[in-house]
């Protein structure tokens, strides 16, 4: 299967499909023509340019007032990529690095960056052959683009750095020799076009949004099972309630729960309690707010991944080369912080339902186990969930609220969007684990409602889950069961 890089809108759903299917990339004629046209314009412009052009004939950052001789312009770009590869910390997961390659190609394909066609084609070759550069999580301020991580992404183009290839971390020069690829000699502006961009942030955001859709759906399914296990009421999910407060996510969540629980014997039973705790009764409002946030963030990120985000921007048709700020990550840093909060809240309310299920209420045994005291049962999984939720709350401090000046004050406001991106991924992972622990608890609790049955949908999930995680009669080693639960919803 092949995906043609074009100027048609690239959606996150398309990205999800092409990554899952192992799709190959191919540069479309429209994109190829735009890249060639821009490079030819820039080459011609360089012949008689009468003024300094930032990053093309000058140094970078606060060194922008230093003019570089024509014979050194290629070396300038080579030096830029080498000197900016200053990332550190943990490495970025390979699937996100692959996303970075895709998004960098997409951004360069519009023909506003001045890169050589061979440079873009090599990025495509790397994507298609799963030659994935080693990129580090720390180092980007999220303005002037993701300089350090994109430098690591592009080092292999010039024969430097390391790559993941066939399960091994190797020197890119060795892999290049094996594949018969030659290092690329960068031309004027190319290094800046490669490094000035938001693809580190955007790739993390796209990956997180793909996971967010999955986790939001599981939050509803697991929440519905917990509602059944807790002998909760269906009335808070009636459509009349949500018609008078018409937030889309709230309406969708309530409708989803009604469908999930359709035909349940448990939900139809007469309830002796007047109302449920907020963690059950307010699921439509809380889960719905997260859905609305996911929807909004997706709309913003889809604009970003269909944009040219480097600097300066080259406009061949208008005979313009403009130094501006499309590299600044603020437009996506704030939404990523919002998404972090939205996903953290899914885990926050999930942990509260876990707590209720083990509290010995509504006919459920203490800690969901026979012989409490002799057995601790599901006591400690709730501790684990609480620990994870607390960590996620700490990660909800908006990275985009911070800014530290750099480059001798020339770059005096930055987005810190890369920090928003990496902590977003951490919260995605945390939320997945908390929801898995809730599923672990909910299936155990549901057993105590027998012989009554839940809905066909919930019972189907229950039956599939029981194939990998058994009912707990007496205390046992639970870590492997929690890990199996995580794998189940993954």
Can you name each region flagged by the protein language model?
Residues 54-68, 72-76, 83-108, 136-158, ...:
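FAD-binding core of FAD-dependent oxidoreductases
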């Amino acid at each position: 299967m092949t995906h043609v890089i074009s100027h048609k809108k690239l959606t996150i759903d398309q990205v999800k499909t092409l990554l899952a299917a192992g799709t190959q990339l191919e540069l479309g004629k429209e994109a190829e023509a735009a890249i060639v046209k821009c490079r030819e314009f820039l080459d011609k412009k360089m012949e008689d340019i009468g003024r300094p052009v930032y990053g093309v004939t000058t140094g970078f950052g606060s060194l922008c007032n230093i003019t570089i001789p024509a014979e050194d312009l290629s070396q300038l770009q080579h030096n830029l990529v080498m000197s900016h590869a200053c990332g550190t910390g943990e490495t970025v997961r390979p699937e996100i690095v692959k996303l970075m390659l895709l998004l960098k190609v997409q951004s360069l394909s519009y023909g506003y960056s001045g890169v050589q066609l061979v440079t873009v084609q090599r990025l495509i070759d790397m994507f298609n052959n799963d030659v994935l550069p080693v990129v580090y999580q720390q180092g980007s301020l999220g303005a002037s683009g993701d300089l350090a991580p994109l430098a690591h992404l592009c080092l292999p183009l010039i024969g430097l750095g390391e790559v993941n290839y066939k399960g091994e971390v190797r020197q890119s020069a060795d892999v290049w020799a094996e594949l018969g690829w030659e290092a690329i000699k960068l031309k004027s502006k190319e290094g800046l076009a490669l490094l000035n961009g938001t693809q580190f942030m955007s790739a993390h955001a796209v990956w997180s949004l793909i996971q967010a859709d999955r986790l939001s759906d599981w939050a509803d399914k697991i929440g519905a099972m917990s509602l059944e296990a807790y002998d909760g009421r269906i009335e808070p999910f009636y459509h009349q309630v949500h018609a008078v407060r018409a937030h889309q996510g709230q309406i969708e969540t309530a409708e989803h729960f009604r469908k999930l629980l359709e035909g349940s014997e448990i939900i139809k039973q007469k309830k002796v309690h007047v109302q449920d705790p907020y963690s059950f009764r307010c699921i439509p409002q809380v889960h719905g707010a997260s859905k609305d946030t996911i929807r909004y963030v997706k709309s913003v990120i889809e604009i970003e991944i269909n944009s040219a985000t480097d600097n300066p921007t080259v406009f061949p048709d208008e005979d313009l080369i403009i130094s501006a700020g499309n590299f600044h990550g603020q437009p996506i840093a704030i939404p990523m912080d919002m998404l972090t909060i939205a996903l953290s809240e899914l885990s926050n309310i999930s942990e509260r339902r876990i707590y209720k299920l083990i509290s010995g209420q509504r006919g459920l045994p203490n800690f969901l186990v026979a012989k409490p005291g002799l057995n601790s049962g599901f006591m400690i999984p709730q501790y684990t969930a609480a620990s994870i939720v607390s960590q996620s709350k700490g990660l909800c401090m908006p990275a985009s609220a911070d800014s530290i000046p750099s480059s001798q004050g020339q770059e005096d406001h930055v987005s810190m969007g890369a920090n928003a991106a990496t902590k977003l991924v951490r919260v995605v992972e945390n939320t997945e684990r908390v929801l898995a622990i809730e599923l672990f608890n909910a299936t155990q609790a549901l057993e105590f409602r027998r012989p009554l049955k839940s809905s066909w949908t919930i019972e189907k999930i229950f039956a599939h889950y029981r194939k990998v995680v058994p009912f707990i009669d007496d205390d046992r080693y639970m870590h492997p069961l929690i890990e199996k639960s995580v794998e189940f919803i993954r």
